[in-house]
């Protein structure tokens, strides 16, 4: 009973956090500031003047960027280059620019970025699209120089940036990587239990039914298996299965109004409560330590005992199975389908985005840098190397030509 209440409490908090923060026309600027379009024109003149004078343009890039120095993947044993690669590549192509990169940990990243912006210490905000009070509306930049956006899978990170018109979505960031959710599953466990693999027709009820059947003693090996895994170490991930359930059922738990303060949240309706009940049932099919991020250490290996993982870790899990020679054992399936006559899947696509700070020193130069980050093929390879999917159609098509098993799932969702 204690475990059940703990899971429900965590799900409640996670759902609110997820809907409030990270996930996928001009907003009103802060008092006394110019419009983004005017600023872009002014900054272009500033950049030209700086170039003519021989002075270097400084772009301060701040945000969550993983590791600064090289690391070694403990499973694949491959070297993963640090984010210094960004500086080396960009400055080599743009000798008039000095990049100053500052990585921060994911812990309390939004608060830290808000503080840095208030101190006028950032130009490009890494993963800052959700912090709408400190970043630019990118509409005027895209209207002036946005042809490259057609080459991206996700053109923008949208947010409700104008609190006086909260029903309107505004582009506040450009995704550099994209992370679609899918169900990664262990074919051997499905085979041991005599069950069909997940496919593009599965509903959330199909997932739960299969998860329940595969939680218990494996009829072939005699070992304990679990039907499902939720990455409970990340609080928003605990809620994403529930959000996916709401999405598939077309259940509205948030009613957006014109003004932010008039927006209503309702988790007590019969339809909303079904989401809590459903995910609580899913939680019963997870390893006991999932709320602390434990229990999936062997997923992707020969000794795995988890049948399904609803995850965005497509690349890192694939790299793991590839290094162990187990790519044939694991499969990738779509997120559960949308119901009530709608087409598609209940997919959550996250990103690692870049945004322009409202008080950036040279906004035109920032836009050029972000455009380069989104389209450069060397950067795309670096993202893949680090276990992420580049948000770049050319790169994805090039990588999918190598027969990556989840390519179709990613493209279609």
PLM regions: where:
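Extracytoplasmic/periplasmic substrate-recognition and gating elements
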Residues: 57, 63, 92, 98, ...
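Extracytoplasmic/periplasmic solute-binding protein
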Residues: 166-176, 181, 206-264, 304-308
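Long, aromatic- and glycine/proline-rich binding clefts that accommodate carbohydrate-like moieties
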Residues: 333-334, 384-413
